[in-house]
């Protein structure tokens, strides 16, 4: 019930046991407290500690400024509460108690001492790593939810386990072991000790398989990044789906995203890095593997339902289209923005879309990059069902139980809304070259001229490749049609427009060169 409430209110939930501090406060409060111990020990001043904290954890305020904003009494009482149940390590430092008793805010002025930066970072990281790994030992929650709590709840750039992987397990172990020399009653948590002996990074899962009665749920859990697809996420998706497909206790698989998005596309940073570092083969392998994962979902013997709530852009919409059925809430918004950033859909979007709603409307959506809400997608046959957020779970369960969860994609011409009845013939084969050459820019028809202006702002080469791929694959078997997207992948990512478009995301509308 609590998880459902979180979904209905657009909140990101994590599952924890009823434990002191739950998950986030369990390591956040000691992080604040350790900052005051560093000050008390004379290792560094407040500006130095705040600077290190901001840089190390990717945040806008250090612990002292944060305590000034949220209240020093809250920090002190939180430490006392945890200490009463967990021991002296959590007790407020003498310096924190003194500041509380003074009734004054922490003084934030002073010069940063560069010589103390490393030791401060080691102490802060050691405290967080120690408590985070002890949460695993106590079974309070898992590392994915701990990291998620840090990123969503505290706005840290990375969660504790991601940071441990970044600095290295050996370094993390040393930071904790050094910190605990001052606490002889404590030992390095067993999970960190074991990971140190293995000498491998933490296996943080961004896609989880959860058995829910006779339903299997594959949940993309990277809400801090809108569940964007990258190499790791796609690998985890593959593994989680294979687990779901082989679970004989379930009759259907639900694909869903945690947080406010289904999947908001692919991780743009990966594409940019591949282009700049001349690693187009890595980009090709990623896309090829992604296609194979979506093909396995498409070809699964089990019923697969994509539960779409929030954004489904690019690769996210392509993932949803690989399911047998798409069930959305009115909050769902979907589209293919790729031609507006210099590329084209590469995970089957050109092929599955054209098969479901026809070439003409597929080209319209891909050429324009238009984002459409769930009700519009339903009206043109791109999604199968739309239910209110408070009904969708029960509707999915009842339709599956009654054997009535069946695809309803595609629409006859006369069933389309008036706007799309007009759009569809405009994107017939004989008119495509005129769209690509900008001949409709001066049209007297307002809809045609407006659409032409939108298309004129897209990457010309991406538009032509998309058109070519849709046409070439339309009469092929789907598996062969999807591979048409791979045939031109290195070519499109080698264009100047691809780099211009991909690096423009979040910075304004790109100006393409057509080369």
Question: What do the PLM-derived regions correspond to, one by one?
Answer:
Residues 257-293, 312, 340-342, 512:
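Glycine- (often His-adjacent) and acidic-residue-rich active-site loop
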Residues 1-213, 221-224, 274, 278, ...:
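N-terminal glycine-rich phosphate-binding loop for ADP-containing cofactors
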Residues 198-260, 277, 281, 288, ...:
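Conserved CoA-thioester-binding segment of acyl-CoA-metabolizing enzymes
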Residues 350-360:
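Hydrophobic, secondary-structure "cap" segments at the distal end of domains
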Residues 325, 364, 368-370, 376, ...:
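Well-ordered beta-strand positions
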Residues 218, 222, 236-237, 255, ...:
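Terminal peptide-recognition signature
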Residues 293-341, 373-374:
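Glycine-rich beta-to-alpha active-site loop
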């Amino acid at each position: 019930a609590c998880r459902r409430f979180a979904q209905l209110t657009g909140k990101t939930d994590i599952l924890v046991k009823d434990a002191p501090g739950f998950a986030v406060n369990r390591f956040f409060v000691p992080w604040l407290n350790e900052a005051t111990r560093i000050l008390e020990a004379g290792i560094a001043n407040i500006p130095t500690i705040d600077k290190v904290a901001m840089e190390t954890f990717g945040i806008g305020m250090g612990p002292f400024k944060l305590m000034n904003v949220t209240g020093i009494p809250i920090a002190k009482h939180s430490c006392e509460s945890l200490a009463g149940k967990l021991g002296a390590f959590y007790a407020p430092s003498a310096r924190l108690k003194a500041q509380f008793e003074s009734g004054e805010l922490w003084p934030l002025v002073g010069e940063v001492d560069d010589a103390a930066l490393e030791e401060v970072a080691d102490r802060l990281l050691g405290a967080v790593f120690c408590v985070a790994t002890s949460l695993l030992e106590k079974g309070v929650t898992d590392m994915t939810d701990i990291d998620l709590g840090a990123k969503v709840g505290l706005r840290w750039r990375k969660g504790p386990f991601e940071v441990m992987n970044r600095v290295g397990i050996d370094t993390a172990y040393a930071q904790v072991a050094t910190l605990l020399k001052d606490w002889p009653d404590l030992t390095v948590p067993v999970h960190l000790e074991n990971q140190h002996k293995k000498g491998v990074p933490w296996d943080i899962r961004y896609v989880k398989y959860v058995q829910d009665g006779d339903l299997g749920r594959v949940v993309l859990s990277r809400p801090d990044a809108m569940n964007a697809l990258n190499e790791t996420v796609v690998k985890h998706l593959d593994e989680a789906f294979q687990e779901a497909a082989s679970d004989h206790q379930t009759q259907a698989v639900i694909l869903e995203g945690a947080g406010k998005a289904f999947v908001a596309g692919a991780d743009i940073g990966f594409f940019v890095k591949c282009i700049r570092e001349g690693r187009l083969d890595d980009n090709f392998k990623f896309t090829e593997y992604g296609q194979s994962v979506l093909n396995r979902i498409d070809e699964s013997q089990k019923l697969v339902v994509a539960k779409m709530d929030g954004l489904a852009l690019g690769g996210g919409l392509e993932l949803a289209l690989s399911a047998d059925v798409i069930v959305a809430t009115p909050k769902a918004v979907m589209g293919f923005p790729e031609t507006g950033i210099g590329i084209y859909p590469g995970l089957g979007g050109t092929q599955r879309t054209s098969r479901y709603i026809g070439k003409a409307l597929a080209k319209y959506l891909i050429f324009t990059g238009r984002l459409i809400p769930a009700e519009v997608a339903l009206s043109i046959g791109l999604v199968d069902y739309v239910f209110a957020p408070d009904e969708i779970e029960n509707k999915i369960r009842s339709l599956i139980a009654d054997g009535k969860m069946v695809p309803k994609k595609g629409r006859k011409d006369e069933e389309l809304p008036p706007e799309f009845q007009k759009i569809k013939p405009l994107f017939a084969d004989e008119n495509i070259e005129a769209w690509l050459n900008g001949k409709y820019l001066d049209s007297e028809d307002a809809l045609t001229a407006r659409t032409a202006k939108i298309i004129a702002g897209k990457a010309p080469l991406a538009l032509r490749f998309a058109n070519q791929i849709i046409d070439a694959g339309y009469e092929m078997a789907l598996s062969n049609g999807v591979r048409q997207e791979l045939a031109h992948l290195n070519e499109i990512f080698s264009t100047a427009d691809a780099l211009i478009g991909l690096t423009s995301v979040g910075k304004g509308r790109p100006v393409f060169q057509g080369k």
